[in-house]
A protein has these predicted regions:
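Acidic-leaning, charged glycine-interspersed low-complexity segments
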Residues: 73-109
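A generic structural signal for short, non-catalytic loop/turn and secondary-structure boundary residues
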Residues: 22-24, 46, 95-97
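Small/polar-rich, solvent-exposed N-terminal microdomains that initiate assembly or binding
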Residues: 1-43, 62-69, 74
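Oligomerization/assembly interface segments of phage tail-like spikes and tubes
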Residues: 45-59, 98-108
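Compositionally biased, intrinsically disordered low-complexity segments enriched in polar/Pro/Gly
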Residues: 40-41, 45, 83-86
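Short C-terminal domain-edge/linker segments immediately following a structured domain
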Residues: 59-66, 82-86
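Hydrophobic beta-strand residues in large extracellular and virion-surface proteins
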Residues: 7, 15, 30, 53, ...
Length: 109
């Protein structure tokens, strides 16, 4: 399963995957970016992937913090997630809507 689909299952269906549409004003999107080489050990291969959560709108800081609390230290039988950056203010978009990002490392077994 694609890592973005897995994250959507954790965060919910209202999260956009891989793109940030112009509407609605209040939105959360998740992006995948360059990953590390697989780690091979005896009888096992672990994959590390990186994701970025980007929030936009009047409540974007609160939403980014809530998302960070949900994902940081999340673990199940297939993945473990750790937060790798603080919630970061990236400014306003071309429509003056506030945006924040937060990044995570996802370990897949």
């Amino acid at each position: 399963m694609n890592i973005l689909d897995i994250i959507s299952g954790i965060l919910g269906d209202d999260v956009k995957l891989g793109y940030l549409p112009d509407t609605p004003d209040e939105i959360t999107a998740v992006f995948e970016y360059s990953a590390e080489q697989p780690f091979h050990s005896f009888g096992n291969t672990d994959f590390t992937e990186n994701i970025q959560v980007r929030t936009r709108g009047k409540n974007s800081y609160t939403k980014a913090k809530e998302t960070a609390l949900t994902l940081d230290n999340y673990t199940d039988e297939n993945i473990s997630i750790i937060q790798t950056t603080p919630v970061f203010d990236i400014g306003r978009d071309s429509h003056e809507r506030q945006e924040y990002t937060v990044n995570f490392k996802v370990y897949r077994r």
